[in-house]
Amino acid sequence: MSIEKLKAALPEYAKDIKLNLSSITRSSVLDQEQLWGTLLASAAATRNPQVLADIGAEATDHLSAAARHAALGAAAIMGMNNVFYRGRGFLEGRYDDLRPGLRMNIIANPGIPKANFELWSFAVSAINGCSHCLVAHEHTLRTVGVDREAIFEALKAAAIVSGVAQALATIEALSPS
């Protein structure tokens, strides 16, 4: 299992992250598609090749091809949107009257239940640090009936995956060349 490979790669100082990674993969708050889509989208958002490869390999056992496509699509479209909306937000409303003019069709037609795509977009927005998108996706999730516990679990999953990526990047940076 690739999650096991990630856990084995984590150093002793990241023991808490290792334990959290074990716990989140056994989550009963999210269904399997929600959980593994969140983990996969979050892994893509970290931009860490090892994290994406290992989580991606295991996610294949839990996600349909459509869900895998949508999770990776959520990471890609949020990579664009998070930069745009976070940047526009820094400009104190001076550009809010202008139409973005960016294609975002996957948001309207993700090929999976809309709530799951929103959950994955929410998780990626947390990793990418876009408060505008995070709030907007949380509002949509609450509007379509996703409970607070599921939203919070997705936030935890994103945080854990981000922590795994940070720990592995630290190991790589400190390794002798």
Swiss-Prot record:
<comment type="function">
    <text>Together with AhpC, DlaT and Lpd, constitutes an NADH-dependent peroxidase active against hydrogen and alkyl peroxides as well as serving as a peroxynitrite reductase, thus protecting the bacterium against reactive nitrogen intermediates and oxidative stress generated by the host immune system.</text>
</comment>
<dbReference type="GO" id="GO:0008785">
    <property type="term" value="F:alkyl hydroperoxide reductase activity"/>
</dbReference>
<dbReference type="InterPro" id="IPR003779">
    <property type="entry name" value="CMD-like"/>
</dbReference>
<keyword id="KW-0676">Redox-active center</keyword>
<dbReference type="GO" id="GO:0051920">
    <property type="term" value="F:peroxiredoxin activity"/>
</dbReference>
<keyword id="KW-0575">Peroxidase</keyword>
<comment type="similarity">
    <text>Belongs to the AhpD family.</text>
</comment>
<comment type="subunit">
    <text>Homotrimer. Identified in a complex with AhpC, DlaT and Lpd.</text>
</comment>
<dbReference type="GO" id="GO:0015036">
    <property type="term" value="F:disulfide oxidoreductase activity"/>
</dbReference>
<keyword id="KW-1015">Disulfide bond</keyword>
<dbReference type="InterPro" id="IPR004675">
    <property type="entry name" value="AhpD_core"/>
</dbReference>
<comment type="function">
    <text>Antioxidant protein with alkyl hydroperoxidase activity. Required for the reduction of the AhpC active site cysteine residues and for the regeneration of the AhpC enzyme activity.</text>
</comment>
<dbReference type="InterPro" id="IPR004674">
    <property type="entry name" value="AhpD"/>
</dbReference>
<keyword id="KW-0560">Oxidoreductase</keyword>
<keyword id="KW-0049">Antioxidant</keyword>
<protein>
    <recommendedName>
        <fullName>Alkyl hydroperoxide reductase AhpD</fullName>
        <ecNumber>1.11.1.28</ecNumber>
    </recommendedName>
</protein>
<dbReference type="Pfam" id="PF02627">
    <property type="entry name" value="CMD"/>
</dbReference>
<feature type="active site" description="Cysteine sulfenic acid (-SOH) intermediate">
    <location>
        <position position="133"/>
    </location>
</feature>
<dbReference type="GO" id="GO:0045454">
    <property type="term" value="P:cell redox homeostasis"/>
</dbReference>
<feature type="active site" description="Proton donor">
    <location>
        <position position="130"/>
    </location>
</feature>
<dbReference type="InterPro" id="IPR029032">
    <property type="entry name" value="AhpD-like"/>
</dbReference>
<dbReference type="GO" id="GO:0005886">
    <property type="term" value="C:plasma membrane"/>
</dbReference>
<dbReference type="GO" id="GO:0005829">
    <property type="term" value="C:cytosol"/>
</dbReference>
<dbReference type="GO" id="GO:0006979">
    <property type="term" value="P:response to oxidative stress"/>
</dbReference>
<feature type="disulfide bond">
    <location>
        <begin position="130"/>
        <end position="133"/>
    </location>
</feature>
<dbReference type="GO" id="GO:0032843">
    <property type="term" value="F:hydroperoxide reductase activity"/>
</dbReference>
